Amino acid sequence: MAKLTKRMRVIREKVDATKQYDINEAISLLKELATAKFVESVDVAVNLGIDARKSDQNVRGATVLPHGTGRSVRVAVFTQGANAEAAKAAGAELVGMEDLAEQIKKGEMNFDVVIASPDAMRVVGQLGQVLGPRGLMPNPKVGTVTPNVAEAVKNAKAGQVRYRNDKNGIIHTTIGKVDFDADKLKENLEALLVALKKAKPTQAKGVYIKKVSISTTMGAGVAVDQSGLTATVAN
């Protein structure tokens, strides 16, 4: 417990909670303060100017980060026939239909992403109570229900992140690892923000991207000054 207290004291000394930092300074701070014994993820929280109580203002989607997430992703695909062969060729670890569903019902969940072709949803639909609570249920809005399962597998392997606002209108996702080059983290963040802007609900009024904070797995959030990001990202 003493180590945690010391770590938090150092973070409080270094990070001004009232300040918005230039993106490069923010990333440097994260790297300096990342003292865990494992390579921490760099996470982002984006406060959106939406009314999350209204379904037509909710933001959900997926985008492939230019430099990936640094995670090794295991993919399960529900499909059959030529699509099954294409999914395997694209790198999917698990491919099947009823047989794969039976594995999952038995508690065998050795995967991070589930993809399904539309004709397989009759099988996947039976797994809603298992996959849903884990955020693994395939959904066309994030590209995981698609006739082109091979492309979806490649996207998942390439570092695709899925995003969905919480009840407070905040998006939480990852943009890489703390050992990534600063430029790569910045470009991943900018790619995410561009995707979020494209997903802006037409009903959302006023400032859309209200606040951007980045943090490491074990660290505190550092607010980012959006004016230091690429012009296409700025509000």
UniProtKB/Swiss-Prot annotation:
Q: One Pfam family for this entry, by name?
A: Ribosomal_L1
Write out the entry's keywords from A to Z: Repressor, Ribonucleoprotein, Ribosomal protein, RNA-binding, rRNA-binding, Translation regulation, tRNA-binding
Against InterPro entries, the record matches this protein to: Ribosom_uL1_bac-type, Ribosomal_uL1, Ribosomal_uL1-like, Ribosomal_uL1/biogenesis, Ribosomal_uL1_3-a/b-sand, Ribosomal_uL1_CS
Per the record, the GO terms for biological process are: regulation of translation; translation
GO cellular component terms?
cytosolic large ribosomal subunit
Highest taxon, organism lineage: Bacteria
One GO term in the molecular function aspect is:
structural constituent of ribosome
Q: How does it assemble?
A: Part of the 50S ribosomal subunit.
Q: Which family does it belong to?
A: Belongs to the universal ribosomal protein uL1 family.
Q: What does this protein do?
A: Binds directly to 23S rRNA. The L1 stalk is quite mobile in the ribosome, and is involved in E site tRNA release. Protein L1 is also a translational repressor protein, it controls the translation of the L11 operon by binding to its mRNA.
Which protein, by its recorded name, is this?
Answer: Large ribosomal subunit protein uL1
Q: Which gene encodes it?
A: rplA
